[in-house]
Amino acid sequence: MRCPFCRHEDTQVVDSRVSEDGAAIRRRRRCSACDKRFTTYERVELNLPAVVKKDGSRTEFDRRKIVASMQLALRKRPVAADAIDAAVARIEYQLLATGEREVRSEKLGELVMNELRGLDTIAYVRFASVYRRFEDVSEFADVIEEFRRASPAKPPRKR
């Protein structure tokens, strides 16, 4: 590795350690020419696919946007931040597993809805109402009826 101080190409690794979060390897290096020390980090580079929007434009995948949209749907719902992070990680894993260079925004929205469905039904309906652009109450009723058919009946809550 090239020295950042004198640009000499011969450096030695003095120490290597796994970072605190386990996501990188930290290496202390020493330049054989100027004897200065510096630190480098080695990380896995994950190439998530570009998102193709409805209008055909392309943008980089942005984890923060997915987290923000899920947080908005889950606002004031009893779901931990760790559960949201895990859901987003599953979405990223699914995208990486496809090996595709691009993903349509519609597909990304479906992945988010699938994760929300498992986390919180209210959040799922909230997200679906915006994502699918519900026009009237009957569309809400259809989604709720879909849930009723899919899940066993629960006893009514006492107030």
Curated annotation (Swiss-Prot):
GO annotation, biological process: negative regulation of DNA-templated transcription
Cofactor note: Binds 1 zinc ion.
Entry keyword Metal-binding: yes
Domain (ATP-cone) ranges: 49-139
InterPro entries referenced in this protein's UniProt entry, alphabetically: ATP-cone_dom (IPR005144), NrdR-like_N (IPR055173), RNR_NrdR-like (IPR003796)
UniProt KW keywords: ATP-binding, DNA-binding, Metal-binding, Nucleotide-binding, Repressor, Transcription, Transcription regulation, Zinc, Zinc-finger
Zinc finger map (unnamed): 3-34
GO terms of molecular function: ATP binding; DNA binding; zinc ion binding
Cofactor(s) named in the record: Zn(2+)
Entries under Pfam families matching the protein: ATP-cone, Zn_ribbon_NrdR
HAMAP family linked to this entry: NrdR
Family as reported in the entry's similarity comment: Belongs to the NrdR family.
Physiological role: Negatively regulates transcription of bacterial ribonucleotide reductase nrd genes and operons by binding to NrdR-boxes.
Cross-referenced PANTHER family: TRANSCRIPTIONAL REPRESSOR NRDR
Protein name per UniProt: Transcriptional repressor NrdR
